Amino acid sequence: MNQDRIKDRILRRALRLWGYNELESENSFDPIVGLLLSAIASELERLGFALESSNSRMIERILELLFPENISGVHPAYSLVQVEPQDDNPSLSLYDSFKTTKNIVNIFNPSENTLKDIYFSPTIETQLHKAKVEYIAFGNDLNKIESYFFTERIGRANRPLKSGELWLGIRCFKEKNIENLQFYIDINNSYQKEFFFYHLKQAKIYFGDKEMQFEEGYNVELKNIDLEGIISKNYHYLSQIYSEINDFYKPYFFTLKEKISLAEQTEKPIIFRENFPEHQLSDAEDIIWLKLEFSEMLTSEVFQNVSFNLNCFPIVNIKNTRLFRRMSGKLDIVSIQSDDHFLDLDYVKNDEGDRLDLKNDNQRINVVLRRGGVARFDQRNASELLQYLLELIKDESAAFSSIGGDMTRETLRSIQQNVAALEQLSKEKNFVQASNPYLVISSANGDTLSCDISYWLTTGEEGNDIKPGTNLEIDNSKSLSFSKAVMLKSSFGGRKSLSVQDKILEYRSSMLSRGRIVTAADIKNFGNKHFKQTISGIEIKKGTKKEVSNKGGFTRTIDIYITRNQSSQPPLSETEWQYLCDSFLLYLEKNSANIYPYRLINK
């Protein structure tokens, strides 16, 4: 309620109490009455604003207590990378680091750009090979794969290959024996995607006359449920992120389980005896040829959109940072200062290498991670108080100006200019969201010890939209050496901490569905929470679709129709939109109680 309306209501109430007609004007009374009413109305208006601010802070604090950090906190971006290792049979480490540089545009000054280092690390400790898929043959064509983005035809068959037959030529640079060969397989036609991957799982793969075991997934075992970590670790947010990313990319990875060797390839493959008899590749001795037999329904029109790649793995926008501190006394506080966002604690070790952050009843040293305030209900930190001070000075400038005098006016003008500059700086630095975490280390005996503190940082949404084909610099790899690292997909999925409005939406969704997705209303509720302002409507209907298999008929489906909001801010790229759609369907398949398949249809 604004000041004029409050003043009008007070005046009408006063007229009734004084026995006057309510239609009497304010000018009918002494001017002091109008001044008093204006002063009271102004203070009541300010009281109303203060009450609304108090309610808002209470709601925000309650939501912060209700939601854990993995729901409301910052989330890193992720992508895929392909490397060319220089060693034989190397294994990745989660601490390997890749770096690129991104140009960050200052929205307050578009002519001023900032170069920021964006770091990525693997999400899985997969095994790599010093090998490369260099040739692919199907139909009438023999193609050379220059890179993930470019393929060149180098031969034409005298007699076309059988329908549904595809050959891969893998160049082995040093390795004579290859085991657990992991392929990343992708198709750049969304309409053929479901059709191709269904038949890929039914395909047979041969090395010579021997049929090989070809399975979906990575060449290392995934630990989706780490029981030991759940029991002993206090902080495992990053493990959940690893699991989420690995599950997202798992359908695109296939592993050749058995060992293959160049020594077993004693004669020319049949492809060079019957289809390309005069091609020079028939004499190459460092290429292993694999034959894949698909259904005859897969023709060259499908195969020309398919790519097979080695030495690919998911990466996530995180950077490992270590801090060494010497502690003394029974209580010590270590602040974690960084320009990037704190994501998760890795470990805290003493001089002997013992983990201090693990749960252990016999341990006399406790380590607790705190974020923001120290468990107070009123958690207004310095940044919030500064924002309040800025608003207060601006609101009270009129009261100071009543003192009069040139000196006073100049002083107030200087204060206002400084406040405006400080406010602009706080917006540019995103100071309102500053919340530096810190470690509270307590010791029962107060002994002096040295601590090795390792933690993970991320740039959040700034890690999004790193373009495909970007060359990554090897920043930190103690056990591996790479000659090249190239990003295959745009990075996406990074976000900043949820706003109060987003937290309210999350809370409402949790209260309505209670974490279950059973009814159409649950699906619609989850869709609104997942897509947020990027869609303008969602509708759930029953439908049918033709099965992909040859012998299958029609099956029932649950069709989800979404209307994309073209005016959403900030605008989404096609890669980010596709990620939202794919992750939405993946979550429904894993958490929904419905037995019918889902179809997502854009209106």
Language-model features: where?
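Intrinsically disordered, low-complexity, polar/charged repeat-rich segments
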Residues: M1-K603
